[in-house]
């Protein structure tokens, strides 16, 4: 057999040469776990005569990726082989790569089609020696295999279909796209991003430095008018934004309902659904930048709208096709009054906005007053509130939607109160900003890699968390996101108008679960809950401090006066809570009142679905969904085991093929293994094994530092009306803005596992550990310089105030009393209202407290999202 070299020469396949290359790339890995000869044997078995060296490297990388379930170091080795292969195929010098991308001629048209803007090209040419020498290519080898494949698939720029960028080139391009000719800031951003302290959001990675640098992730659009002109102007705006990789949140409360009178034609309206289907087809047609990812719109509607029942069902897999829009995401913008009526089993009146104008323009007491006046005037149709609630829960169990966002909490606890009523969130329900027909709200995102701040002592005995460094990095990101506002390409003028006036930004996080596992803190532990508060207090303080410093240099944002912050009111003040005590808030508060802020909003933890894959961490602030899962790449599907768990089981001496097969049969859970220490069972609980009450409590703990909102998913193995009702009401009473992004449920029935030998899997429970305990660093809590100076008094005061300032009402409603002492996944529901329901038979079926697991209503359950997991 022979291999074809990159220069076209033929050379015999040499076993020793492959082994030598594998060994060379295994530096720093565990020599007792990495078997270069075994890897080479597997590679040779897949080689054919005439294979190219590129194909050989790809085969080697895939072979190591498949062996990740043997030891986590194989994942590192797979990445090194793949990245080494890319380095051989690409130009090393950054300035030359930029030149090639800028000078590209499209072979199909023969025309100049630059992928890099003239501005960035000129900056690189003027500073090429500095920039070329600053790049550290060894940092490419820190990516995981699947992180690198994610970059390769969607993020690295290509020439003639072939990848032209290296990961370090991308990072430098992003830094230049943000900071332009400010080379000092460019190098600072490059170094921190390449060292994996943080990442900017996908649109920034896609588009920074290109001729149309649309770097914003989120756009909140107002339906311009209830007319053909207004609807289609809005549709065009959505298409223009989606074309440049923006996600869309659109509120449609002002569109009249089915059967409403149309004066212009003397006819009646077809209602929301036919219009929604037009938006659905636009989302399908306009992908985000050449199939990098599909277009995505979320539609927000308040539950008083007369078409609400059809709206919540638009993603169902069954029913008439003409009333479905499965590529859109329905979301509810819920006033407190609706939740009260459901809780009381009271009436709820549905209106057409043409008959009951202005309901979406007011919130709180003003909304209640206007809504009840319209009810008294008989302008709508009255139903039981629980009938609508039942329909919402039924849709959520089948499709995971509609999303739940609480209108009054969003408007009551925002620094944009002085702008007007906020009417929607964004696609992922973490951005909460004011929008109007002439202002499309925009937000630029970045996420901090929380595991980067875990520090282990030199002797390996203790581990701690570096809050000072976290604070420092969060300030750098704030400066970056603020600069994106000025350097961004805006696809529509309404977006530029809004962003330049209010200048909101959004910092998020990724890898909170990884951080807990590195520090050996179970997700439900008190230490983990304390660290959760400390991390988010630190980031919030850093963003405000940086924004205040920017205001002193560049001026406050134009609508600062009249905002809560201008009066010294910060996010935790709006919750009637006091901060944990890590930082000096009083000095910062005075500085903000005196100098202002450069940005109206700064915090919004987002899902980080793609970027967390790049850095190799768990998404945002969520627990792990499984300790074993599949990763799909173009070449196939790979099994991946939680690397922290895998390392522990390997070191205990109980990891082998039977343990792997056991994990597959148990959907990644280790709770049923008698030979695994209880300490590990607690540490590696999946989200399905963690109390949802804990998830919501931790969300509320961090929410007092989040001036927008955060994308909170809820998880239930066996959803029932009672459980979902309990979760929603608990979150609402805790004061959350986003009550639920997706409802995640497990498959109703497990797929037949043809590849599993059950006898082999059963052997996993019989293994005996070779060591009695693992040698792992012990977490030592640390504060900041400020908190250490005032440790005793600050922590005691914080603890007392948090108890006093709990946003949960003290009165015991049927819902809150049931929630006080139970886990949300337990089969204990709020009490059924005592009054007799004197309605028609349809109303009697709507038992929102039923504990029976909800059965799928789809005629073909295999097509249902919930049933298929």
From Swiss-Prot:
Site, as annotated: Important for electron transfer: 741-742
Subcellular location per the Swiss-Prot or TrEMBL entry: Cytoplasm
Cross-link Glycyl lysine isopeptide (Lys-Gly) (interchain with G-Cter in ubiquitin) residue location(s): 387
InterPro entries to which the protein is assigned, alphabetical: ATP-cone_dom, NrdE_NrdA_C, RNR_lg_C, RNR_lsu_N, RNR_R1-su_N, Rrm1
GO biological process: deoxyribonucleotide biosynthetic process
Residues at which dTTP binds: 226-228, 243, 256, 263-264
Phosphoserine sites (modified residues): 227, 806, 827, 868
Name of the protein in its database record: Ribonucleoside-diphosphate reductase large chain 2
Organism: Saccharomyces cerevisiae (strain ATCC 204508 / S288c) (Baker's yeast)
Gene: RNR3
């Amino acid at each position: 057999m022979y291999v074809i070299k990159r220069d076209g020469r033929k050379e015999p396949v040499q076993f020793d040469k492959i082994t030598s290359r594998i060994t060379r790339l295994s530096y720093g890995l565990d020599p007792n776990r990495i078997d270069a000869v075994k890897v080479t044997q597997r590679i040779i078995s897949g080689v054919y005569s005439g294979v190219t060296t590129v194909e050989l490297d790809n085969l080697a990388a895939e072979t190591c990726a498949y062996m990740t379930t043997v030891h986590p170091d194989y994942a590192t080795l797979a990445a090194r082989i793949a990245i080494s292969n890319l380095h051989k195929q690409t130009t090393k010098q950054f300035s030359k790569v930029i030149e090639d991308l800028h000078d590209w001629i499209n072979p199909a048209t023969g025309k100049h089609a630059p992928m890099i803007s003239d501005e960035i090209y000129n900056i690189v040419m003027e500073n090429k020696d500095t920039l070329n020498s600053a790049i550290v290519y060894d940092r490419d080898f820190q990516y995981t295999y699947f992180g690198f494949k994610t970059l390769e698939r969607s993020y690295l720029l290509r020439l003639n279909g072939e990848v032209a960028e290296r990961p370090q080139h991308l990072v430098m391009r992003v830094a230049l796209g943000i900071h332009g000719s400010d080379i000092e800031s460019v190098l600072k951003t490059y170094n921190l991003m390449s060292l994996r302290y943080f990442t900017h959001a996908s649109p920034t990675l896609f588009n920074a430095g290109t001729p149309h640098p649309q770097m914003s992730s989120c756009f909140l659009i107002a339906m311009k008018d209830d007319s053909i002109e207004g609807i289609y102007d809005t549709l065009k705006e959505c298409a223009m934004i989606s074309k440049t990789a923006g996600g869309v949140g659109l509120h449609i409360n002002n569109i009249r309902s089915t059967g409403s009178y149309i004066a212009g034609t003397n006819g009646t309206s077809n209602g929301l659904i036919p219009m929604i289907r037009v938006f659905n087809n636009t989302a399908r047609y306009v992908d985000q930048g050449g199939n990098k990812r599909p277009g995505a719109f979320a539609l927000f509607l308040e539950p008083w709208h007369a078409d609400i029942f059809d709206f919540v069902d638009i993603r169902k897999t069954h029913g008439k096709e003409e009333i479905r829009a499965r590529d859109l995401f329905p979301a509810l913008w819920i006033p407190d009054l609706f939740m009260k009526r459901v809780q009381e089993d009271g009436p709820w009146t549905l209106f057409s906005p043409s008959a009951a104008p202005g309901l979406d323009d007011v919130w709180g007491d003003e909304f209640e007053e206007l809504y009840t006046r319209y009810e008294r005037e008989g302008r709508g149709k009255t139903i039981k509130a629980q009938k609508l609630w039942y329909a919402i829960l039924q849709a959520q169990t089948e499709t995971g939607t509609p999303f739940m966002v609480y209108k009054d909490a969003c408007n009551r606890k925002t620094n944009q109160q002085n702008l007007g009523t906020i009417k929607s969130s964004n696609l992922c329900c973490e951005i909460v900003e004011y929008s109007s027909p002439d202002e499309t709200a925009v937000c630029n995102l970045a996420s901090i890699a929380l595991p980067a701040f875990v520090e282990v002592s030199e002797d390996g005995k203790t581990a701690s968390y570096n809050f000072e460094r976290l604070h420092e990095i969060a300030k750098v990101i704030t400066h970056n996101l603020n600069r994106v506002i000025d350097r961004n390409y805006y696809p529509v003028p309404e977006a530029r108008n809004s962003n330049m006036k209010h200048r909101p930004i959004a910092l998020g996080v990724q890898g909170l679960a990884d951080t807990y596992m590195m520090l050996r803190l179970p997700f439900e532990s008190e230490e983990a809950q304390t660290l959760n508060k400390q991390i988010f207090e630190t980031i919030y303080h850093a963003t405000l401090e940086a924004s205040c410093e920017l205001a002193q240099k560049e001026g406050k944002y134009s609508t600062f006066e009249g905002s809560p912050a201008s009066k010294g009111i910060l996010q935790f003040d709006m919750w009637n809570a006091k901060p944990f005590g890590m930082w000096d808030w009083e000095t910062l508060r005075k500085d903000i009142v005196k100098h202002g802020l450069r940005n109206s909003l700064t915090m919004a933890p987002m899902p980080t679905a793609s970027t967390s894959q790049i850095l190799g961490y768990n998404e945002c602030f969520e627990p792990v969904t499984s300790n074993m899962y599949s990763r799909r790449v173009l070449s196939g599907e790979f099994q991946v085991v939680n690397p922290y768990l895998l390392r522990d089981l390997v070191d205990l001496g109980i990891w082998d093929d039977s343990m792997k097969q056991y994990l597959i049969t148990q959907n990644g859970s280790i709770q049923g293994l008698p030979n695994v220490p209880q300490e590990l069972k607690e540490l590696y609980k999946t989200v399905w094994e963690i109390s949802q009450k804990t998830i919501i409590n931790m969300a509320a703990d961090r929410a007092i530092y989040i001036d927008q909102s955060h994308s909170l998913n809820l998880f239930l193995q066996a959803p029932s009306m009672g459980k979902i009702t309990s979760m929603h009401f608990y979150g609402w009473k805790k004061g959350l803005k986003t009550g639920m992004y997706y409802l995640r449920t497990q498959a109703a029935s497990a797929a037949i596992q043809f590849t599993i030998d059950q006898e082999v899997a059963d052997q996993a429970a019989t293994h005996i550990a070779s060591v009695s305990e693992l040698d792992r660093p012990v977490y030592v809590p640390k504060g900041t310089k400020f908190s250490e100076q005032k440790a005793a008094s600050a922590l005691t005061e914080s603890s007392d105030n948090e108890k006093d300032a709990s946003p949960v009402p003290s009165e015991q409603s049927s819902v809150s009393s049931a929630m006080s002492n139970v886990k949300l996944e337990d089969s204990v529901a709020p009490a059924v209202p005592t009054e007799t329901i004197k309605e028609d038979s349809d109303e009697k079926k709507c038992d929102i407290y039923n504990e029976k697991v909800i059965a799928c209503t789809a005629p073909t359950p295999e097509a249902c999202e919930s049933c298929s997991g």
